[in-house]
């Protein structure tokens, strides 16, 4: 997601949609009564015939529809503004928002929580290290929201039949990757390359630091061409998505462990979480996407805003998440506490 323009006085935010996760977040954030401005098409009668005409309209939102693993968000509502010659003001219409589209969202008041989630989504494309490796060369790059920055590019001695050279090259590449991990502060790496050599480098990295999250993929060469090949694939979005799921899974594991030990450091259900938040006790909170959309929006928005003000971490669990049903069984909203409140 890319923020193109924000007008605080008007309450308008212009965005460029870059991936499916952006659409899902907009499904959560766009509420009934909000307004959007977007390009669309509509059937217009032309005498006996009708034609589908492209136009830009302003829509007052009634509801949104999003189906997981699609690339489209359907926004239903009433047309507030459109070209006069078509005479469609006040009519019902559905805007189909897709990857690559731009949209302006207008709200009476943007919550800090909503703006923070959008900024987080924009910043996601910023902390990913990519290392392409082969037996005698490597290239290391940092993927940022501004683009790709090459950090290192080097040719090494060709091993031939000398295993010592192979091991030396593996050692150098692994240490170089680890040094850039520390320098950039990333915690997710993609290692790619032709053949099995990439797996050997991955094993060496795991020996040095087994806490790093490493994804392995194949490309035709450890070069800039190979880097472009990797960037054209879906693995980048997949890595970000899986990393967020892994974070949520760790929180849930801690929640379940504390529940089993009866430590008093877990609360679930809206009322108990409200009480915990009043005391500043909410540390990490998991909330299912349908709980977020089905519950009274003003109540839940106010609660989430206050939790974030008090430095609590909130993670929204989508329906396709492997932990969705476990969180759903805990009422759909569950929190790990900083301290006992009973």
Curated annotation (Swiss-Prot):
GO biological process per UniProt: nonfunctional rRNA decay; nuclear-transcribed mRNA catabolic process, no-go decay; nuclear-transcribed mRNA catabolic process, non-stop decay; ribosome disassembly; RNA surveillance
GO molecular function: endonuclease activity; metal ion binding
Source taxon at top rank: Archaea
Location(s) in or outside the cell: Cytoplasm
InterPro entries, per the entry: eFR1_2_sf, eRF1_1_Pelota, eRF1_3, Pelota/DOM34_N, Pelota_arc, Ribosomal_eL30-like_sf, Transl-rel_pelota
SMART domains: eRF1_1
Pfam families in alphabetical order: eRF1_1, eRF1_3
GO cellular component assignments: cytoplasm
EC number(s) reported in the record: 3.1.-.-
SUPFAM superfamilies, A to Z: Dom34/Pelota N-terminal domain-like, L30e-like, Translational machinery components
Cofactor: a divalent metal cation
Keyword Signal: no
Keywords: Cytoplasm, Endonuclease, Hydrolase, Metal-binding, Nuclease
Domain notes: The N-terminal domain has the RNA-binding Sm fold. It harbors the endoribonuclease activity.
Subunit structure: Monomer.
Role summary: May function in recognizing stalled ribosomes, interact with stem-loop structures in stalled mRNA molecules, and effect endonucleolytic cleavage of the mRNA. May play a role in the release non-functional ribosomes and degradation of damaged mRNAs. Has endoribonuclease activity.
Family as reported in the entry's similarity comment: Belongs to the eukaryotic release factor 1 family. Pelota subfamily.
Protein's name according to its UniProt entry: Protein pelota homolog
Organism expressing this protein natively: Sulfolobus acidocaldarius (strain ATCC 33909 / DSM 639 / JCM 8929 / NBRC 15157 / NCIMB 11770)
């Amino acid at each position: 997601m890319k923020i193109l323009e924000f007008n605080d006085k008007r309450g308008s935010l212009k965005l460029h949609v870059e991936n499916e996760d952006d659409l899902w977040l907009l499904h959560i954030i766009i509420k009934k009564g909000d307004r959007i401005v977007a390009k669309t098409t509509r059937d217009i009668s032309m005498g006996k015939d009708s034609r589908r005409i492209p136009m830009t309209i302003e829509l007052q939102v009634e509801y949104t529809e999003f189906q997981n693993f699609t690339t489209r968000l359907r926004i239903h509502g009433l047309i507030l503004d459109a070209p006069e010659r078509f005479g469609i003001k006040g009519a019902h219409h559905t805007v189909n928002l897709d990857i690559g589209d731009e949209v302006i969202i207008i709200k009476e008041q943007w919550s800090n929580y909503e703006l923070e989630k959008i900024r987080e989504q924009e910043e996601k494309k910023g902390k990913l290290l990519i290392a392409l490796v082969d037996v005698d060369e490597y290239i290391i790059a940092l993927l940022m929201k501004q683009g790709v920055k090459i950090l290192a590019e080097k040719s090494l001695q060709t091993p031939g039949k000398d295993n010592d050279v192979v091991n030396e090259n593996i050692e150098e590449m692994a240490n170089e990757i680890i040094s850039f991990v520390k320098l950039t502060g990333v915690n997710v790496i993609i290692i790619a390359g032709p053949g099995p050599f990439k797996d050997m480098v991955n094993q060496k990295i795991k020996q040095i630091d087994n806490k790093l999250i490493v994804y392995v993929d194949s490309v035709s060469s450890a070069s800039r061409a190979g880097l472009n090949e990797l960037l054209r694939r879906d693995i980048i979005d997949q890595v970000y998505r899986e990393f967020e799921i892994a974070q949520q899974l760790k929180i849930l594991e801690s929640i379940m462990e504390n529940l089993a030990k009866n430590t008093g450091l877990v609360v679930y259900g809206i009322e108990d979480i409200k009480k915990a938040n009043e005391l500043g006790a909410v540390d990490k909170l998991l909330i299912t996407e349908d709980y977020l959309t089905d519950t009274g929006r003003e109540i839940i928005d106010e609660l989430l805003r206050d939790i974030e003000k008090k430095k609590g971490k909130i993670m929204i669990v989508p329906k396709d998440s492997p932990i969705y049903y476990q969180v759903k069984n805990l009422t759909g909203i569950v929190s790990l506490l900083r301290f006992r409140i009973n």
